């Protein structure tokens, strides 16, 4: 199903029906919060109680090799050591998350795990083929994300696995917005309501 038209209308429809899970939030240019400037967030969970997401384009000065070394996990595949670790959000940055794809009878699903066993499997090249490693997450209380979207802080964009796993980190902000036909670089930092 392809939806077209004003992305703000699409955002309102999605918010009112609470179907933001498995979507991206793309920070609008006027969002001047250090943590969220030019952020792309994968929304893992959204319901009446709030939302949880992971920033997918903010690398830390940390690699998976350093994390595995800290956890005393031996690396069987040397190339895995250079895998970037991302700042997943401002909450719980002492906690790590693995964002990965898993096949199910309903099709591919994106899941989050905090399992040390999964990190061990990844180090042994027995884990998922595609994954992100993050520290922290972004969270919203009931109604908070909806208010931010209504304030034009975020574009709501349908999920795309290439953006999540294949697009270079520096290109994800532009490429995610382009999924709904928006050239984010052409938008003004001064946006309001008509």
From Swiss-Prot:
PANTHER family (alphabetical): UNCHARACTERIZED PROTEIN YQGE, UPF0301 PROTEIN YQGE
Top-rank taxon: Bacteria
InterPro entries per record: AlgH-like (IPR003774)
GO CC terms: cytosol
Pfam family, one: DUF179
Cysteines paired by S-S bonds: none
Name of protein: UPF0301 protein CBU_2093
Family of the protein in this entry: Belongs to the UPF0301 (AlgH) family.
């Amino acid at each position: 199903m392809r939806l077209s038209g004003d992305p703000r209308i699409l955002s309102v429809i999605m918010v009112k029906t609470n179907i933001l899970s498995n979507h991206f939030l793309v920070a609008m240019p006027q969002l001047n919060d250090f943590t969220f400037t030019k952020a792309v967030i994968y929304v893992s969970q959204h319901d009446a109680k709030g939302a949880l997401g992971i920033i997918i384009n903010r690398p830390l000065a940390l690699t998976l090799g350093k994390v595995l070394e800290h956890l005393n996990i031996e690396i069987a595949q040397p190339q895995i050591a250079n895998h970037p670790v991302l700042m997943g959000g401002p909450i719980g940055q002492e906690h790590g998350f693995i964002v990965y794809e898993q096949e199910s009878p309903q099709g591919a699903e994106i899941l989050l795990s905090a399992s040390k066993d999964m990190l061990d499997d990844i180090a042994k090249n027995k884990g998922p083929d595609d994954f992100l490693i993050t520290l922290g997450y972004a969270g919203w209380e009931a109604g908070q994300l909806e208010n931010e979207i209504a304030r034009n802080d975020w574009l709501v964009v349908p999920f795309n696995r290439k953006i999540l796993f294949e697009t270079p980190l520096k290109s994800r902000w532009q490429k995610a917005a382009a999924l709904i036909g928006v050239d984010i670089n052409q938008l003004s930092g001064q946006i309001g309501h008509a």
